[in-house]
From Swiss-Prot:
Keywords: Isomerase
Listed GO MF terms: intramolecular oxidoreductase activity, interconverting aldoses and ketoses; L-ribulose-5-phosphate 3-epimerase activity
Name of the protein in question: Putative L-ribulose-5-phosphate 3-epimerase UlaE
Entry keyword annotation includes DNA-binding: no
Pfam families listed in its UniProt record: AP_endonuc_2
Organism, as annotated: Shigella dysenteriae serotype 1 (strain Sd197)
Family annotation (SUPFAM superfamilies): Xylose isomerase-like
Length: 284
């Protein structure tokens, strides 16, 4: 029987670095999490996961079965290095190949959702052509995802092109495909001049997961919980009242901390307390 608990997960980069997924999932279970979100970023080390052998993929699946801790989502930030909007055809082709491999990987190991980074380009100057290429790249990507039955979910970003749910909804309407949805980050959403609660309500019916972190205007990473501008209780209340029942993911970058597990446990307790205050009694 499926649990009625609110699924609460932790980002891979919050936990100690390494490639042993059995150890990582066991630690996540000990810390009280339901799932771990995998990172495939722009480093060669994490990009190489997309070329894992059959045996390596099976080892991940076996670790999931053994621990009972799922890996239902992938944060695919590799497109910062190989953007779909690049005006360099070779770079853009690499970006599309990364997407193809990520979708195949997800299909093989049971990942249901791939979070996309909403950058047309990251290290280059953006223009109308980079945005057009980005849109076309998303269209190709969603066609691949549809065939594989893997959801692509756009993150609300630290970048003007995709810094609100309203903007991301424009792409959802343009693509008009059930395999393209939204993955808001309430930290990023709050760091911009957005009506956060209205934005969350506007996204209902398209939100498949939520990133939980604190931010300040212009500071999108490593802001300790409670020291930023995010009104967590109101965000949780709005999502609950709007009918959202999906997963929440605590996003942290504590893998290089002196004691990552202690940092994560502290953050989990802090977030769960705010969830309880917001009336999400299942999370108390």
């Amino acid at each position: 029987m499926l649990s009625k608990q609110i699924p609460l997960g932790i980002y891979e980069k919050a936990l100690p670095a390494g490639e042993c997924w059995l150890e990582r999932l066991q630690l996540a279970k000990t810390l009280g999490f339901d799932f771990v979100e995998m990172s495939v970023d722009e480093t060669d080390e994490r990009l190489s996961r997309l070329d894992w052998s059959r045996e390596q993929r099976l080892a991940l699946v076996n670790a999931i079965v053994e621990t009972g801790v799922r890996v239902p989502s992938m944060c695919l930030s590799a497109h910062r290095r190989f953007p779909l909007g690049s005006e360099d055809d070779a770079v853009r082709a690499q970006g599309l190949e990364i997407m193809r491999k990520a979708i195949q990987f997800a299909q093989d190991v049971g990942i249901r959702g791939i979070q996309l980074a909403g950058y047309d380009v990251y290290y280059q100057e953006a223009n109308n052509e980079t945005r057009r290429r980005f849109r076309d790249g998303l269209k190709e990507s969603v066609e691949m995802a549809s065939r594989a039955q893997v959801t692509l979910a756009m993150e609300i970003m630290d970048y003007p092109l995709m810094n609100s749910i309203s903007k991301a909804l424009g792409y959802a309407h343009y693509l008009n495909n059930p395999w393209f949805q939204l993955y808001p980050d309430i930290g990023n959403l709050s760091a911009w001049d957005n009506d956060v609660q209205m934005e969350l309500q506007a996204g209902m019916g398209h939100i498949v997961a939520v990133h939980v972190k604190d931010t300040k205007p212009g500071v999108f990473k490593n802001v300790p919980f409670g020291e930023g501008v995010v009104d967590f209780e109101r965000c949780f209340e709005t999502l609950k009242q709007s009918g959202y029942c999906g997963p929440y993911l605590i996003e942290m970058w504590s893998e290089t901390a002196e004691d990552p597990a202690a940092e994560v446990a502290k953050a989990r307790d802090w977030v769960k307390a705010r969830m309880a205050k917001a009336g999400m009694v299942e999370a108390a």
